[in-house]
Design a protein with these regions (language model features):
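N-terminal Rossmann NAD(P)H-binding glycine-rich loop of SDR-like oxidoreductase domains
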Residues: 9-28
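SDR active-site strand-loop-helix element
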Residues: 12, 36, 77-83, 124-130, ...
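C-terminal substrate-binding subdomain of Rossmann-fold SDR/epimerase-dehydratase oxidoreductases
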Residues: 28, 35-36, 201-326
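N-terminal Rossmann-fold cofactor-binding loop
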Residues: 36-41, 59
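Rossmann-fold cofactor-recognition segment
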Residues: 49-61
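NAD(P)H-binding glycine-rich loop region in Rossmannoid oxidoreductase-like domains
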Residues: 59-99
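Conserved internal alpha-helix within the Rossmann fold of NAD(P)-dependent oxidoreductases
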Residues: 62, 104-107, 233
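Catalytic helix-loop patch of NAD(P)-dependent Rossmann-fold dehydrogenases
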Residues: 91-109, 118-123, 131-177, 185-188
Length: 326
């Protein structure tokens, strides 16, 4: 991800998995990076020496958001803010609605107002999700695949995605979207199943835990490595591409695969003996088996995933030992 063009990048969701990697990558090329975080957020120590300007505020306050545009006059905005847990969206659909849909509506309005006031286009990159497509697709998912959302999270992200397309085609705003398939890293929060598995494997290998309780381990997903996907975002933004791009590996792996690899990396070969199935953890309307077709971004920008599924899990298990020293 190279620039050095004097761009000004405004990132919403800057302390999340994707936002943190994006802020780091952008800060290395000499551009200005403004990272918007919650008032209650604590900035990790490792960011202290990086060229990132952290701004606290409530992104659901449209006045605050527009004031950022007036103050910093960004060339790029990245919306990575998301209430991204599918299961939690059932428990708190209002939060999902406000963050995943209404904030996007407000952000588009702010960008449009800024353009009318200053005659300056701001490139907006919206992070969309493969959850929009539902569980019944038999073929590789392309950018044109029909949406069939099956959860509050998926429904709100689908509506937000369509808002972006409408604003681009009707109002001429410079908006790109990345349709992200599942992607993990050591920075995934612990409430996500990938971290639950890598943390569990590490703790079991150290004799601290006796079992790992999971839902349906036969679920299959198209999993990639988060920094690879963030690199795709940078390529799209650098070229100001007002278009939609699937970012995926095109390969399916199961939760059982993830468990086997994680336990092997941790030095535990009989992993099946430590797994406990809890049917209460089975997700309704599970989006299993979706594969993404990333040929569009590969052909246009030369992007392809670098880190393999096995390498990703290895990185995550090794990171558990550093984060949770015993």
């Amino acid at each position: 991800m190279t620039s050095g063009q004097g761009y000004r990048h405004l990132i919403f969701g800057a302390l999340g998995q994707d936002g943190s990697y994006l802020a780091e990558q952008l800060s290395t090329n000499g551009d200005q990076v403004i990272a918007v975080i919650r008032n209650s957020s604590v900035v990790p120590k490792e960011y202290s020496n990086k060229n990132i300007n952290f701004i606290r505020g409530n992104i659901l306050d449209g006045g605050f958001v527009y004031s950022l545009l007036e103050r910093y006059k960004p060339t790029h905005i990245y919306n990575l803010a998301s209430a991204s847990s599918v299961s939690e969206s059932y428990l708190n659909p209002e939060q999902s609605l406000q963050v995943n849909l209404e904030f996007v509506r407000s952000l588009i309005d702010c960008v449009d107002r800024f353009r009318m006031a200053h005659g300056q286009d701001i490139f907006l990159l919206q992070a969309s999700t493969s959850e929009m497509f539902g569980p019944d697709h038999q073929n590789l998912i392309t950018e044109e695949a029909i949406h069939d959302p099956r959860s509050p999270y998926a429904e709100h992200k689908s509506l937000a995605h369509n808002l972006c397309i409408q604003a681009r085609t009707t109002n001429g705003l410079k908006i790109g979207t990345v349709i992200l398939f599942n992607h993990e890293s050591p920075r995934r929060p612990l409430n996500f199943v990938s971290r639950k598995i890598t943390r569990g494997a590490y703790l079991i290998s150290q004799g601290v835990r006796k079992e790992l309780v999971l839902g349906n381990i036969n679920v299959q997903r198209d999993w990639g490595y988060a920094p690879d996907y963030v690199h795709a975002m940078g390529l799209i933004a650098t070229d100001f591409l007002s278009d939609d791009f699937v970012v995926a590996t095109g390969q399916l792996r199961s939760l059982d695969d993830m468990c086997r690899i994680a336990f092997k990396v941790a030095g535990v070969l009989d992993y099946e003996n430590y797994l406990v199935s809890d049917k209460s953890l089975f997700r309704p309307n599970e989006n299993s088996g979706l594969k993404g077709d990333a040929s569009k971004i590969r052909d246009k920008l030369g992007w392809k995933p670098i880190v393999t599924f096995e390498q990703m899990i290895e990185k995550m298990v090794f990171a558990e030992g550093k984060e949770s020293p015993l």
